[in-house]
Amino acid sequence: MCKNLVEKGNLDKPLIIFNRTTKRATDLKERIPSGKSIVVLNIEEAVSKSDIVFTCLGDDLAVKDTLATAVKGDVKGKLFVDCSTIHPDTTNELAKSVEEHGAHFVACPGTPSTCSRPCKKLILDQQYSEHPQWLRTANWSAF
């Protein structure tokens, strides 16, 4: 996903990469064209420098912990896109928390069983039509 964002997205600034295992983030950076990404060492820095934050984590607890840390800073107006495959109740809980902090939340899980491709496209198209500024210059991060 990061490689596609960098190669096919219209990014004016480098993609910000964070991983709980720093080596994974630096390994990913090495696979992306030079100058197109930077690695940060903590969630707070990634979120503070970003307008759009993608998360893709292994389980419900990891997503909850990550977003709980992410919303501690100023997230007003930011867009969080979670691509993790987690329980719908967890997704609803996370959406509520993110929105209570003044940010926006889109669930875009990675498996068709949870949300089919047309459904994902519809969700994203709806979000972008309501918030066209997200299609313009933005700082993106992924973790």
Residue ranges and their predicted role:
Residues 1-55, 114-117:
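NAD(P)+-binding Rossmann beta1-loop-alpha1 motif at the extreme N-terminus of oxidoreductases
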Residues 33, 70, 121-124:
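Short low-complexity, flexible loop/linker segments enriched in glycine and/or proline
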Residues 43-106:
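Rossmann-fold NAD(P) dinucleotide-binding segment
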Residues 20, 58, 135:
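A conserved hydrophobic position in a structured secondary element of the catalytic/binding core
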Residues 2-3, 29-30, 65-68, 92-95, ...:
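Short amphipathic alpha-helical segments
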Residues 85-143:
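Rossmann-fold dinucleotide-binding core
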